Amino acid sequence: MNIIFITLSNINGVEERGIYADLMRKFRDEGHQVHIVSPFERRLGQATHLQEVDGIRLLKVRTLNIQKTNVVEKGLGTLLIEGQFQRAIQRYFGHIQFDLILYSTPPITFTNVVKYLKRKNPKAISYLLLKDIFPQNAVDIGIFGEHSIFNWYFRKKEVALYKASDFIGCMSPANVEFIRKHNPYYPAERVEVAPNSIEIKPLSDSPRGGEENKNLQEERTKRKVESIYIRERYQLPKDKPIFIYGGNLGKPQGIDFLIQCLEANKNRDDCYFVVVGNGTEYKKLQTWYNANFNLNVKVMQRLPKEDYDMLARSCDVGLIFLDHRFTIPNYPSRLLVYLQSSMPVICATDPNTDMGRIAEENGYGYWCESNNVPAFTALIDKMLASDRKAMGQRGYEFLKANYTVQNTYDTIMKHF
């Protein structure tokens, strides 16, 4: 099949690691012809161009800065990107007959691109990978009001995108329930779980023979040595459990609550906290960190993915934070790194997100609401007293059973 994937993510090839690169690599490896449309933000200083890389065709479209920028440029860039993408697709892919039209949110402003592709390819299936429920998430955290013209405009865009989609793949059961409840015009049977997913390296699979046992032991020894090296490299303690948060540091993550949790636990001598990332709220966190230097906390700017993954593997517990005001369920993809590293998790989220409940039900994590610092501290105590290795293994097994690209690939392909 000919497949086109339209995304805001900066993809430079499918041999990278990430939820979209892994999924597109799976489609390629299954024999499909993969075409990806991805932005080149203005800050990178390059023009729109088409390239062939890793056995796929990659169309990089010059846009304004959309991610990790100010609200004005982000908003303008989001409005303009639809036309920029459509013109580029017409120029470079206009002669191709597509069978599957894949696209992800954010943004919700690809409706005309999807409609154009469906007109040109009337037999194609359009499939939305829903990673962001906008504009309701922006209303929830006060970016604009429920009755504002912005919410009215973007809600119309959201509805139009859903109507242009033959199927909507959501990140979790709570996502599915939310979309069905708030969009009754859309056929409920066409909303399904197509979760964030990754490719898992084969060596980490459960051993079945002597040679595999030997390989697994070698892998564990390698990871133990790697952990010592990484902790030395980043000046982290070797004798304490380390709790790590890695990812975006913006308004959706509820950074004020994260800071309150770090403040409440900063004098502990039985554990250590590492925060890695960047975003609009990073300076706020950095200011707090500078005033509390040399305690049991380390704050670091975003690392290259390979370096971050190595750091995560050297830690003991993964942390998830989301703003308590959210009425929409979220499912941050950083969970996958934690589970692949066989780490248990603590999720501090709004009550509508089901990530924490799924973790508790399956024995690989704990959950509290992200407006209760004492409850978070109690979970730190509980985690320190738990069998973290067993919890981490349960998380890894859950990842293998539910969050591999094979799961997402099969979910999409069952419609053909």
Regions found by a protein language model. Give the residues of each.
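Conserved donor-binding/catalytic core segment of Leloir-type glycosyltransferases
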Residues: 237-253, 259-262, 274, 392
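A short helix/loop element that forms part of the nucleotide-sugar donor recognition site in Leloir-type
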Residues: 48-49, 204-236
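Nucleotide-sugar-dependent
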Residues: 14, 253, 304-313, 318-339, ...
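Membrane-proximal helix-turn-helix segments that form the acceptor-binding/catalytic region
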Residues: 112, 116-120, 148-168
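Carbohydrate-associated surface elements
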Residues: 40, 171-174, 194-197
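Nucleotide-activated donor-binding/catalytic signature segment of Leloir-type glycosyltransferases, i.e.
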Residues: 222, 268, 274-277, 282-309
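A short, well-ordered alpha-helix in the C-terminal region of glycosyltransferases
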Residues: 232, 389-402
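N-terminal subdomain of nucleotide-sugar transferases
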Residues: 1-57, 262-265
